[in-house]
Amino acid sequence: EGWTTNDTHQHTSEKGLTTLVKVTNHITITTRANRAMVRPPATSSNAEEHVSADGILGSIKSTLDGISGTYIICSRAGNGLHLYSRNKFGVTTPEKTLMSITTSEVNTIADLPSTCRHGYVVRVVNSEENQDDYFLKFKVVGIADEITQFGTYTRSAQVITITIANHGLQNEDQIILDCTEGGGDNSIYNVINRTDDTFQVQGDTSGTISTPQQCNVTPVRIGEGVWEEVVEPGKPIEIDNTTMPIALTRVLPGTFSINGGSNTSYPNGAFRFSYPDWGKRDCGDDITNPEPSFIGQTIQKMVFFRNRICLLSAENVILSRPNDFYNFWNKTAMAISNAD
């Protein structure tokens, strides 16, 4: 354990023969192990005893919280439990008719819960074919689409101090910490020692980071809400407008300052130069909603056809959405719409 490529070891046998061993290649093997086995206490067969989902879920949460070394954070989520760990893990149940498990993929939207963590993303696979996959993101009612805040952090031993101006968090609030720089541990933490512009969290590992490093902080918000279609996480969603055709818009006669110069009267009007907004990919992946084929190619001609802009590039004619002239992305990955 711990050997890497080019490591060497010298061994001398009992007969005095010295051998030098050099590691020429190595691979890391990941094995699976059970972190915990949890079951609620057995219920009585007495019909007079009341058995509730709240009682069963509360018992499972208490049992899981009481097991040390799992590094799994358990939170109540309506008639279910939300489990989080910075390390990969899986969950199984022998009673699939009584308990459903939602991870990063589901077979149908019928498998999705009505109460979940705000921002949770799943892939709906539908079938073995990739052409009908799409992605959904959970939005808790009454919470803004984007609640991630950007700040810096330092670390002393197990305590991480995060600085975000007017963060609005309270002690015991849960947050998801994403350390984009440095050696902080990405995980869910409880807020402690908060002030208006700083707060602390305590992790499981120790270290020292004196120079502030960048991080993203997302408050954990769990509640009832809806699932909305989104793009696959990590995929590019915008077109670089500096590489696309520009817009020239004629403006009425007036006095204008062009390129920072002095105000000049233009009695015949002028043309304003701008970069159009070429829309965003807000659903699908590279199969169900790929980048327009003119990306990386030369646009040879532009025409206007039935309320669409058409671009000729290489051997393709690429059409925008109707009445949305600069948007070349599909409207949805769930079906072929009239706008596609």
PLM ranges: what are they?
Residues 276-307, 312-340:
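Beta-propeller and closely related beta-pinwheel folds
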Residues 36, 54-76, 115-127, 134-141, ...:
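Ser/Thr/Gly-rich low-complexity blocks that favor extended beta-strand/coil architectures
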Residues 1-8, 25, 29-35, 39-41, ...:
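Acidic/polar, low-complexity linker and loop regions
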Residues 4, 12-14, 295:
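Conserved loop/turn at the beginning of each blade in beta-propeller domains
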Residues 23-25, 29, 34, 38-42, ...:
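Polar, low-complexity export/assembly segments characteristic of proteins
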Residues 19-20, 301:
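Conserved beta-strand position repeated once per blade in WD40 beta-propeller domains
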Residues 86-116, 143-253, 266-267:
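Small/polar beta-strand repeat architecture
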Residues 30, 177-179, 312:
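Residue-level recognition of conserved beta-strand edge/terminus positions
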